[in-house]
C-alpha cells in the first residue's frame, strides 16, 4: 500500500522477453480493467487503415460511419486499432514528429507519445522489409535498455509505433 491505494493488491508481472526490466516488475493491477483499443483520428482513414494492413498485416474487421465520419476497426496482435476520419466541428491539430534527444526519443509534448508492439520474429529482417516498402524510421534499429532490439516507425497521421524484439 505504498501508493495509498488499499483496494488494489500488489502483483508481479513476469515478462521474460523484456530483460531491460530485469525480467519482472511489481505493479498494481485492477482486474476490473482489460485493454480495449487505440483510437486514431486520421485525415485519410481508409488510406491509413490500408497502411496498417500492408505494412503490419493488420486485418480490417469493420468499416462503418460514426457521427458522419468513417470509422475503421483493425485487429493487430490481438488488439483493436480504430481509425476514424474528421467529424463536423472538430479542428484536429497536426501531431508533432518524434525527435531524438541525448539518450531517448520523444514527441516532446504532453499526451500519448507512442504505442508499442512486441515483435515475435526476426525484427531486423522485418525492419529491412519495411524499409524496402518505404517506411520511415525516426529511430533506427538499436539496442534498448537491457540489450533488447527496438526501433520506431513513423505511421500515418503522426503516429509513432515502437517495435521491440520479443
Q: How would you describe each model-predicted region?
A:
Residues 9-17:
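Intrinsically disordered, low-complexity segments enriched in serine/proline and basic residues
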Residues 44, 121-122:
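Acidic/polar helix N-cap motif
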Residues 40-90:
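Core segments of cupin and vicinal oxygen chelate
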Residues 21-49, 112-115:
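N-terminal beta-strand motif that seeds the catalytic metal site of vicinal oxygen chelate
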Residues 20-31, 73, 127-166:
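Vicinal oxygen chelate
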Residues 99-105:
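Short, P/G- and charge-enriched loop/turn segments at secondary-structure junctions
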Amino acid at each position: 500500500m505504498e501508493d495509498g491505494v488499499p483496494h488494489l493488491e500488489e502483483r508481479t508481472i513476469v515478462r521474460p522477453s523484456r530483460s531491460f526490466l530485469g525480467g519482472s516488475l511489481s505493479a498494481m493491477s485492477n482486474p476490473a480493467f482489460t485493454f480495449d483499443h487505440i483510437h486514431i483520428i486520421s485525415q485519410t482513414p481508409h488510406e491509413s487503415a490500408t497502411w496498417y494492413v500492408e505494412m503490419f498485416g493488420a486485418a480490417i474487421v469493420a468499416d462503418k460511419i460514426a457521427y458522419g465520419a468513417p470509422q475503421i476497426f483493425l485487429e493487430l496482435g490481438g488488439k483493436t486499432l480504430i481509425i476514424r476520419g474528421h467529424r463536423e466541428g472538430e479542428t484536429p491539430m497536426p501531431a508533432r514528429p518524434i525527435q531524438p534527444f541525448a539518450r531517448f526519443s520523444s514527441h516532446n509534448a504532453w499526451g500519448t507519445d507512442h504505442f508499442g508492439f512486441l515483435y515475435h520474429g526476426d525484427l531486423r529482417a522485418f525492419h529491412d522489409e519495411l524499409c524496402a516498402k518505404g517506411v520511415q524510421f525516426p529511430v533506427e534499429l538499436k539496442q534498448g535498455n537491457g540489450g533488447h532490439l527496438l526501433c520506431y516507425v513513423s505511421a500515418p497521421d503522426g503516429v509513432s509505433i515502437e517495435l521491440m524484439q520479443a
